[in-house]
């Protein structure tokens, strides 16, 4: 459990780590790079690098913090990967339910398994302190929103459009009804792919029209002006303005 520089959360909690590539957005996975670095450093728990690994010793970590905290769950993996047993996900949920003072953000690319877990396995029971999200990097992955929207009892349903690799338009604009929050950001790293300003403005405009909070995280390695430079130097402003809105909790 660690503090993080990710601006849309407060701490990361990794009761598991590791993943396998699933779609285009996975090509330059930051978590894979970090896991292999930790493996090379001999860090305990990362002996297998980025292979899917359960971390049962981490299950109770949130219980040690009394102050209400926002946790990004499995920042170094995907909780709904097929190699994570359902029984283990149950244990993660037990910890979440035992910590009602905290908020837990769960983000996945395995939208169908997440849907089946909450709708079928848990009979629609989603802990009130859980926010559920799916990653969408281009128009081909817009389909991931459908299973997410079908999880009716989620307090917050959100999209992480990072890295945004194309305009979210496939014959028609992405349908955002039923979505409570949208995060957007560009890719970082030496092999980062550019994010066009047009794509960002299109997504922001759709959010504005629906009254959905829009959180622009960063331009990444390629700036608003299309120039490649350090991601920090490229910043997180659009036309000089910061747009980092949060969902409204009923």
Regions found by a protein language model. Give the residues of each.
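Conserved AdoMet/S-adenosylmethionine-binding subsite of the radical SAM
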Residues: 54-215
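Auxiliary Fe-S-binding modules of radical SAM enzymes
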Residues: 1-17, 21, 38-41, 149, ...
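N-terminal [4Fe-4S]-dependent radical SAM core
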Residues: 1-71, 248
């Amino acid at each position: 459990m660690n503090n993080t520089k990710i601006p849309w959360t407060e701490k990361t909690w990794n009761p598991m780590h590791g993943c396998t590539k699933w779609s285009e957005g996975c090509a330059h996975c930051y978590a894979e790079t970090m896991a292999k670095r930790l493996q090379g450093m001999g860090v305990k728990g990362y002996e297998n690098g980025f292979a899917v690994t359960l971390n049962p010793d981490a299950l109770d970590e949130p219980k040690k913090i009394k102050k209400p905290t926002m946790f990004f769950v499995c920042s170094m993996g995907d909780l709904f990967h097929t190699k994570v047993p359902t029984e283990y996900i149950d244990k993660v949920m037990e910890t979440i339910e035992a910590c009602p003072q905290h908020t837990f953000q769960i983000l996945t690319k395995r939208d169908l398994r997440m849907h089946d877990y909450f709708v079928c396995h848990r009979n629609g029971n989603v802990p009130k302190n859980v926010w559920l999200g799916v990653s969408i990097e281009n128009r081909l992955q817009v389909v991931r929103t459908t299973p997410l929207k079908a999880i009716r009892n989620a307090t917050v349903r959100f999209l992480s459009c990072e890295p945004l690799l194309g305009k979210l338009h496939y014959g028609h604009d992405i349908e955002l009804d039923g979505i409570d929050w949208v995060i957007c950001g560009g890719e970082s790293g030496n092999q980062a792919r550019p994010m066009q300003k047009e794509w960002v403005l299109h997504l922001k405009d759709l959010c504005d029209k629906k009254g959905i909070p829009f959180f622009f995280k960063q331009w990444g390695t390629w700036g608003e002006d299309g120039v490649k430079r350090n991601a920090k130097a490229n910043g997180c402003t659009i036309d000089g303005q910061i747009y980092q809105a949060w969902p409204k909790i009923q």
